[in-house]
């Protein structure tokens, strides 16, 4: 996506985004937090935090930071341009069959879009858990606020 390229995002891990993902994980108490940039054919985890409870095979699966656009829930968030709350992905037939359920073991998801000042949905800030989790309205408001905060940081970097 051209806008990601203009911003220098979506191709390389960024320690600042990893730190942001760590903070998102801390704030939400989620074991896995990501800043995910969505491109035409793939997703790239520009920021990644995997807490101590994440099993080794899951960590290994995340190491490359690149996934097909068909995997996960972030592409749905970008297309809808709205936050998505899945307390238990298995409760939603549309999402229960996603490859990340079997490959990574994701059971709950909370994500919000990163919509920049030009109106482009760059990707998401999201957290997942390997167990069902009631995120509730507080979780929704938190992830939306964190997404807005990150967009502001991206804009500030763009000006420098």
Where are these regions (language model features)?
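Regulatory sensory and allosteric helical modules in signal-transduction proteins
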Residues: 38-44, 54-107
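Intrinsically disordered, low-complexity terminal regulatory regions
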Residues: 1-70, 138-140, 144-149, 153-160
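PAS (Per-ARNT-Sim) sensory domains
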Residues: 123-124, 143
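A short, aliphatic-rich beta-strand micro-motif
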Residues: 108-116
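Glycine-biased flexible loop/turn sites that connect beta-strands or occur in inter-domain linkers
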Residues: 35, 118-119
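Short hydrophobic/aromatic beta-strand element in the GNAT-like acyltransferase core
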Residues: 32, 74, 111, 124
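Residue-level recognition of short loop/turn positions
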Residues: 80, 117-118
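Short beta-strand-to-loop transition segments that serve as allosteric relay/switch motifs
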Residues: 124-133
């Amino acid at each position: 996506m051209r806008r990601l390229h203009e911003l220098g995002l979506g191709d390389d891990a960024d320690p600042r985004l990893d730190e942001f993902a760590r903070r998102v994980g801390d704030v939400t108490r989620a074991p896995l937090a990501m800043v995910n940039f969505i491109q035409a054919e793939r997703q790239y985890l520009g920021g990644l935090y995997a807490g101590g409870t994440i099993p080794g095979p899951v960590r290994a699966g995340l190491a490359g930071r690149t996934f097909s656009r068909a995997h996960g829930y972030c592409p749905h968030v970008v297309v809808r341009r709205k936050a998505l709350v899945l307390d238990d992905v298995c409760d939603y037939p549309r999402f229960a069959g996603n490859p990340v359920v079997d490959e990574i073991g994701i059971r709950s998801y909370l994500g919000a879009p990163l919509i920049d000042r030009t109106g482009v949905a760059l990707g998401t800030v999201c957290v997942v858990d390997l167990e069902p989790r009631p995120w509730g309205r507080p979780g929704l408001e938190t992830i939306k606020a964190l997404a807005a905060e990150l967009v502001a940081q991206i804009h500030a970097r763009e000006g420098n």
